[in-house]
Amino acid sequence: MKVASVFTVKLLPKDIQQLALFLDVDGTLYEIENSPSLIKPCFKLQKKLQTIRNRLGGALALISGRSLDDLDRIFENDKISVAGNHGAQLRDTLRLKEYQAESGKIKGIAYKISELLNGKKNIEIENKGSNLTVHFRNSTIDRKEINKIMLEIVKYEPKLILLEGKEVLEVKPLSHNKGTAISYFMRTKPFIKRRPIFIGDDVTDEDGFETVNKKGGWSVRVGNYKRSKAKFFLPNVKSVHEVMKQLLKSR
């Protein structure tokens, strides 16, 4: 596989009104913390996002695995378009779309996993309604062990899929991902007919990269991973903020 090139704002057209910007949150806008709850609101980041959104005529969206409630807690802004739970929740300035068809099964899976992982220290099980996330960043549990446990449960659910991320495993609807979220926004104003940029850092962002590539946009992974669909990369979170700073200087 071809190694991705370093992303730079110089690759973009001078008129940023032609662009639509999609941003992951954890590992992209924020450094990854030991627990999702440790991420706190940042006024400077909120102001920066709002300014870029205004420059883009509103064509900026957050594409995250977090729930909408959690994203609202962090960003304190209902004007920015948001996709939560890996595309199972979508909100633009006009409407909210939410996929909850499997929420009952998610609750049952959460109970089963809690029983099977009972006694395992530093494992956080997060039921997000349409999705279920198991965080084990601070645990000594073997990744293969927890992966096997969750696969055994999910394999009997044809409408659900197990997604592996950085020190997390997520059970989510098969029909929704970050790629479908980006496609949804690209069919609506003010994103329509623009060229997309998507910046993310994890395996969970690969569907988004693939979608953006098909639409002739710029797919950017934080960290240079050879096994990625992203065409470009940025070395770290700091470099993402540098790109945002440069966008603020654009016309």
Regions found by a protein language model. Name each.
Residues 85, 91-111, 163-193:
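Substrate-recognition "cap/lid" segment bordering the active-site pocket of phosphatases
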Residues 40-127:
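Active-site phosphate-binding/coordination module
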Residues 2-4, 16, 174, 181-251:
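Mg2+-dependent phosphoryl-transfer enzymes with acidic/Ser/Thr/Gly-rich catalytic loops
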Residues 67-83, 142-161:
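Substrate-recognition/cap helix-loop segment adjacent to the acidic, metal-dependent catalytic center
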Residues 115, 124-140, 162-172:
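Charged, glycine-interspersed solvent-exposed loop segments at helix/strand-loop junctions
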Residues 27, 82, 134, 182, ...:
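Residue-level signal for inorganic ion chemistry
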Residues 1-25, 29-33, 37-40, 44, ...:
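Non-catalytic pre-domain segments flanking phosphatase-related domains
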